[in-house]
């Protein structure tokens, strides 16, 4: 399939594709003295990606490659800028500049044919368990492979290339991603499996969550704490004194992340978090985004019914505006913990029947971190 990003508005291209295009353009300029305004790339599925180039110029500190047959000095360094385009996908990297410096050198023994390094704005891995080794730049394997496959034919047999990636806004943007939690510091990651960003698929985001499990296992944690997000993380650390690496934030994607847990051999999970998200699991809802399914009031009404005979109170629960409002009703009836203990028990029953081989426990908290209910595996 051909993706022409001069015309394409729905799909976008990844940070990895930006680097490939920038590297190709820079080397082509050095070899042929021609400034390309588009680059045609190929991904691992043999799709064609046509990516626009923002700018290309000789490197600021162009060293001397050689004196060619015409007697002219030939520079060996170029800088290319490619603007990231995310199509219709919601992506914080949309529109940022990816700067790629290329340097051509004579092939040397024990030197790689193509060397790929990071610069300012590209994160550095500081924890074990990820696809990239600790201490290296967070440039994932697939983009590395795509870079090499697309530029190898531009190089002479006696020639090697150094590709350096800089992202001017990378360090600032990284604070809005999972990178700090994963131990990737100083910038964003260079990502992309196919090089194409697909709109609103959530696939890229879900895949970015999964490495948290790898980090936890690499640190030899046996019991992992799965939580929807910041509230759960905050209070898990306070209540249990655990490190960030022991906590896995699943966002809304419980089914995906529990599948990954089984795949990676996790044996013990504590489901911990705010009632508004966790109670959905008791209803068999494993994508907890409100646009997918809600049913919080219906679930709370159902699990309150064994303890309440008054139909009007049950109706008040059903038509409450927030979970917090329902909590107040249950407190007034002196059945708060009974209801949430029952919900926690049902959460454990449901996930245990679907994801066999994992010991589950569940703790449900309110916005202040107080425990509403729990069911601990024994």
From Swiss-Prot:
UniProt record similarity statement: Belongs to the CbiD family.
GO MF entry, a single one = cobalt-precorrin-5B C1-methyltransferase activity
Protein name (database record): Cobalt-precorrin-5B C(1)-methyltransferase
Asked if Methyltransferase is a keyword of the record, the answer is yes
Q: Which domain of life is it from?
A: Archaea
Which InterPro entries did the record assign? CbiD, CbiD_sf
The beginning of the lineage is: Archaea, Methanobacteriati, Methanobacteriota, Methanomada group, Methanococci
Which Pfam family is one of those matched by this entry?
Answer: CbiD
The residues forming the signal peptide are none
List the EC numbers from the record.
2.1.1.195
What is its EC class? transferase
Q: Does the keyword S-adenosyl-L-methionine apply?
A: yes
Pathway involvement?
Cofactor biosynthesis; adenosylcobalamin biosynthesis; cob(II)yrinate a,c-diamide from sirohydrochlorin (anaerobic route): step 6/10
What are the UniProt keywords, alphabetically? Answer: Cobalamin biosynthesis, Methyltransferase, S-adenosyl-L-methionine, Transferase
Q: Which reaction does it catalyse?
A: Co-precorrin-5B + S-adenosyl-L-methionine = Co-precorrin-6A + S-adenosyl-L-homocysteine
Q: Which organism is it from?
A: Methanococcus aeolicus (strain ATCC BAA-1280 / DSM 17508 / OCM 812 / Nankai-3)
Q: Which GO terms describe its biological process?
A: anaerobic cobalamin biosynthetic process; methylation
